[in-house]
C-alpha cells in the first residue's frame, strides 16, 4: 500500500507547524509609503487580483527544444510565444510521446502501465483514485515535527563520530575540507537521516545554509555502511532543478572524494540536458556510479531506456530545491520518476527513502510530498523560526529608489563604478529580468568599469556556462551579470554584494538572489535599484516573507552621467527596441501579482527608450498591432503613451512599412 505524508494533517505534537505560510508583522514600515507617496490601502493585495488571461511574455530565454533545466522562471499561468512557455498544468513530459508508458525493454506491458500510472491520475495511488483530492487515498504516514527550538544541543562532527553516527573515514574527509562547525540544517538532519532508516525526511532551511552537505554526508555514510552491496550499483538519485545546480552538487561530491581515497570507490555521475546522451551512458557503464545527479528531463530519458540496467538497487532519492522544481513545472515529472524508481526496485516498491529539501513549504510542496513518500513515518525538520525573516540575517539589505526605471540603470552603473574601484577584491552578482537586458548591461559594463565581467543566462550553451561558473568561482574579483538562472543553489565563494535592477520573476526569488552572499557564516550585502512605482513589491515581501528593508536611499540622476552613458551605448535603435520590449513583456506578466499600477509602470519602462537616446519625446516605433498583440496590449489605451504606432495602410497595401524589429519572429 502506498504511504503518504501530509504536512496539513498532523497530531497535537506538531500543531506548531499548522500555519505553513509565513506572515510578517502587521505593522508595515512607513518608509516604503513615504517614498511611494500614497496610502497603503490604495493597493490591492495579491489575492484580490484576478488572473488576466491576456498577460503574455516574450520567451527570450527559452530554446527551440524544451530542456529539463529551462531558465525562463515563469509562473505556470503565463504565456509565451511559439509554444515554448509553460502553460497551466504543463509538464515537460508533454513533449515526449513515449512517457505514458515504460519502454518494453524495462519489462512492462505498455497498456497495463498506462492504466496503473496514468499521468491524468492526480493522486497516483495504486488503487486508481482519480478524484483529484488534495490528500490521496492510502495510509497516512506518521508525522514527527522537529522544530528549530526543540533542542539547544550543538551537534558537531566530533559528537557524531563519538556516537558512531559517522565513520572515521567520513569524519576525516569532512574535517580536511576545513569545516569549523555544522550549520543548523546539518545539525538537525544528518543524524536523523542516518539513524532513522525507516523514515522519509522533509527539511526546510534558508538558502545558503548548507543543505547540500546535509544530504551528501548521510548518503556517503550509507554507502560506507553497505560497502559490499553498494559498489558498482546506483544507490542514490539526486534530482536538481537546473543543470548548473546539478553540476555544482557533483563538484561537492568530488571534493569529498579528494579528501579520502576510500570514498573514491563510490563514483558519481551527472545527467543533465545540453550534454551528449550517448557519451553519458558510456560513462555510466564505465565507472558504475553509486550516486547519480540529474535534472528531471534527462533522468527520465535515461531511466526509460536503461532503467533495468542501472536503477534497480536505489536506496535514496533526494529532491534538492523542491520548491524550485515545482515552480518550473516539474511536479508530474517528479511523480513519474518516483513511480519508475519504485517499480524498478528489486527490494520492494516502498524500499526507497525520500529526502526532500526546500527553502519554502507551500501547498505545492505538500502535495508533492503526498505523491512521493514511501515510508510509514516522515520526519519534518524545520530550521526556520516562523517569526524570523526568511532572508539571511547576516545580509545588509538596501533599496536605492529613483524616479524612473531609467534611473535604475544609472544608479547601478554609478554604484559598480564606485565600489568596484575602491573595494579590494570586489566580487559581485548583478541580477536582471531578461536575457536581452542582461546582454545589454554586460556590454555596457565591460566599457564602463575595469572589472572582469561575466555574462550568464539560459541562452548560453551548457559547456560555456560550466566554464563561466568554474572561472567565476576561482576569481578574486569580478562581476557576474545574470538572469534568475543564477538565483538558486549556485555557491560562489566570497561574494561581496548582490545587486538587482528591477524585480525578480517570483517573489521568493528575491530571497534566493540575495542568498548568493553571506554564505558559510559570512556577512554580505545586497542593493536593489528600483523606481518608486515598484515599491509595492516590498510591501508584499514583508507581509508574506517577513522581510523588512530599513536602508532606503533616494537616487537623483546627474545629467552629465546620463549624457555620458548615452554616448557609450553603441547599440542600434532596433536593438534597443528589442531590449526595452523584453522588459515590458517581463513586467507585463507579473505586475498585478506585485500590486503595481501597470498604467504607470509600463509607460515608464517604455520611456527608457527615449531617455537612453537623449530624446525624452522619442517613443518606440511600431508598425500596426503586430507587436502589441504579442504583448497582449492591442486593446490597451496606454499603448499610445508608450509607442509611436504607425497605422496599417489601406486594403490595397496591407503590409505597410515595417522596421527590422517588426519583421522578426518570436
Swiss-Prot record:
Q: Where found?
A: Mitochondrion matrix
Short sequence motif named DEAD box, residue ranges: 320-323
UniProt source species: Candida glabrata (strain ATCC 2001 / BCRC 20586 / JCM 3761 / NBRC 0622 / NRRL Y-65 / CBS 138) (Yeast)
Q: Which PROSITE patterns match?
A: DEAD_ATP_HELICASE, HELICASE_ATP_BIND_1, HELICASE_CTER, Q_MOTIF
Q: Where is the composition biased (Polar residues)?
A: 120-131
Q: Where is this region: Disordered?
A: 38-131
Boundaries of every Helicase ATP-binding domain copy: 192-379
Q: Write out the catalysed reaction.
A: ATP + H2O = ADP + phosphate + H(+)
Q: Record's Gene Ontology CC terms?
A: mitochondrial ribosome
Transit peptide: which residues? Answer: 1-22
Instruction: Tell me the name of the encoding gene.
Output: MSS116
Name the Gene Ontology molecular function terms of this record: ATP binding; ATP hydrolysis activity; G-quadruplex DNA binding; G-quadruplex RNA binding; RNA helicase activity; RNA strand annealing activity
Q: Which Gene3D superfamilies match?
A: P-loop containing nucleotide triphosphate hydrolases (3.40.50.300)
Pfam families this protein is in? DEAD, Helicase_C
What's the name of the protein? ATP-dependent RNA helicase MSS116, mitochondrial
> Which purpose does this protein serve, as stated in its record?
ATP-dependent RNA helicase required for mitochondrial splicing of group I and II introns. Also required for efficient mitochondrial translation.
The alphabetized UniProt keywords are:
ATP-binding, Helicase, Hydrolase, Mitochondrion, mRNA processing, mRNA splicing, Nucleotide-binding, RNA-binding, Transit peptide, Translation regulation
Record-listed E.C. numbers? 3.6.4.13
Q: What is known of its domains?
A: The Q motif is unique to and characteristic of the DEAD box family of RNA helicases and controls ATP binding and hydrolysis.
Binding positions for ATP per the UniProt entry: 205-212
Could you state one GO biological process linked to this protein? transcription elongation by mitochondrial RNA polymerase
Q motif, short sequence motif: residues: 159-187
Determine if RNA-binding is one of this entry's keywords.
Answer: yes
Quote the InterPro entries the UniProt record gives. DEAD/DEAH_box_helicase_dom, Helicase_ATP-bd, Helicase_C-like, P-loop_NTPase, RNA-helicase_DEAD-box_CS
